[in-house]
Amino acid sequence: IYPTKQIKNNYNMQANNTIRLRAISKKYPLITQVDRNIKNNFQDFWALRDVSLDVCKGEVLGIIGRNGAGKTTLLNIIAGVLSPTKGEINVDGRALGLFNLGVGFQDELTGRENIFLNGAIIGATKEELKNKLISIIEFSELGNFIDMPLGTYSQGMRLRLGFSIIVNLSFDILVIDEVLAVGDTLFQSKCFERLMDFKRSGKTLVITNQSMDLIERLCDRVALLDHGQLLFQGNTTEGINKYHALLNTEKFFVGPAQ
């Protein structure tokens, strides 16, 4: 979970609340030789190139593509963790990014204390966390362990606590990157149902996941990325079929999204 900065945000929520991306590009410098002191050793790597997308209020958009396609970079830009190198982004409402669960947790603090610490990092107020405390603890199913030091938790327990914090806070847009394999099968089902509740209540979700079954069950539309470019946006089933075709071919034409 990362704190999110808002880019051109409008907190007076409009009926047509959207995420609007126009010609978004993001580059990183790559070191091409071992000697880090020579400027010529750097070359630009474009993680995203001219990506334009709209996400409407209450829509669930799936971002799909092969490893290295640019999915995580795009989600980080939407959540405000990264700024684009080029292009324009408008995000209406409070966006929360659900990435590495439990970032900022302190092992010497109890689960209860970490709720307030992690919540503050995300940007929640102390009053909001107090009001949501019981809901967070109940959703996590940690029971008496909530008052034990986090250092005594298993990895699964830490992930459950991190997920429980984020899904019980107030937000308009939730950005989720590959973090739904939390806990056992029953808890994962519970997490999926909470996301379905968000969908039914009109929240906006942007999600990436390697499970195309989950993407098909949850998403209204998909956007297919490859080598940082948008190949397709539209119908979920059609997009997944194009993704599978991409996996099965060595070469794929990179052109404008349909």
Could you say what each language-model-derived stretch is?
Residues 13-49, 236-257:
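Pre-NBD coupling/linker segments of ABC/ABC-like ATPases
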